[in-house]
Amino acid sequence: MYACSKFVSTRSLIRSTSQLLSRPLSAVELKRPQMPTDEGLSCLAVRRPLTSLIPSRSFQTSAISRDIDTAAKFIGAGAATVGVAGSGAGIGTVFGSLIIGYARNPSLKQQLFSYAILGFALSEAMGLFCLMVAFLILFAM
């Protein structure tokens, strides 16, 4: 009983366990197991690595993992598509401001119209950029 309690409460076991759990997953998978070096463990006949006492975490390549990746892809594409609605709101704001400006000062008709076309082009370009990002997320990743 004394040997078992000494084995469980060994400082090196606690230290290596906490180091193992605090390391990233790739380091846990790729690092070779360490052999115990404490003198208190020498009374045990079977020597096993300290990392074998903790269940090994493995990379997830299951169907659930792929479903999560697909859902994240759709969520990202949907969030990028929201920018297209912002483009529509921008175009409406540009032409609404054109009408208000023309009503206030009809003599600036040509200058206001050229600025409205510039605002329309910039807003439409941002909308197309958002749509392109959405398609890249869906089909290129």
UniProtKB/Swiss-Prot annotation:
The chain crosses the membrane at residues 82-102, 117-137. It comes from the Eukaryota. Trimethylated by ATPSCKMT at Lys-109. Methylation is required for proper incorporation of the C subunit into the ATP synthase complex and mitochondrial respiration. One of its GO terms (cellular component) is cation channel complex. Disulfide bonds: none annotated. PROSITE patterns: ATPASE_C (PS00605). InterPro entries: ATP_synth_F0_csu, ATP_synth_F0_csu_DDCD_BS, ATP_synth_F0_csu_sf, ATPase_proteolipid_c-like_dom, F/V-ATP_Csub_sf. GO terms for molecular function: ligand-gated channel activity; lipid binding; proton transmembrane transporter activity. It holds the Pfam family ATP-synt_C. It is a multi-pass membrane protein. Keywords: CF(0), Hydrogen ion transport, Ion transport, Lipid-binding, Membrane, Methylation, Mitochondrion, Transit peptide, Transmembrane, Transmembrane helix, Transport. Its main location: mitochondrion. The record marks 124 as: Reversibly protonated during proton transport. It is found in: Mitochondrion membrane. Residues 1-66 form a transit peptide. One of its GO terms (biological process) is pore complex assembly. The modification N6,N6,N6-trimethyllysine is found at residue 109. Mitochondrial membrane ATP synthase (F(1)F(0) ATP synthase or Complex V) produces ATP from ADP in the presence of a proton gradient across the membrane which is generated by electron transport complexes of the respiratory chain. F-type ATPases consist of two structural domains, F(1) - containing the extramembraneous catalytic core and F(0) - containing the membrane proton channel, linked together by a central stalk and a peripheral stalk. During catalysis, ATP synthesis in the catalytic domain of F(1) is coupled via a rotary mechanism of the central stalk subunits to proton translocation. F-type ATPases have 2 components, CF(1) - the catalytic core - and CF(0) - the membrane proton channel. CF(1) has five subunits: alpha(3), beta(3), gamma(1), delta(1), epsilon(1). CF(0) has three main subunits: a, b and c. Interacts with DNAJC30; interaction is direct. There are three genes which encode the mitochondrial ATP synthase proteolipid and they specify precursors with different import sequences. They are expressed in a tissue-specific manner. It is linked to This protein is the major protein stored in the storage bodies of animals or humans affected with ceroid lipofuscinosis (Batten disease). Belongs to the ATPase C chain family. PANTHER family: ATP SYNTHASE F(0) COMPLEX SUBUNIT C3, MITOCHONDRIAL, ATP SYNTHASE LIPID-BINDING PROTEIN, MITOCHONDRIAL. This is ATP synthase F(0) complex subunit C2, mitochondrial. It comes from Rattus norvegicus (Rat). The gene is Atp5mc2.
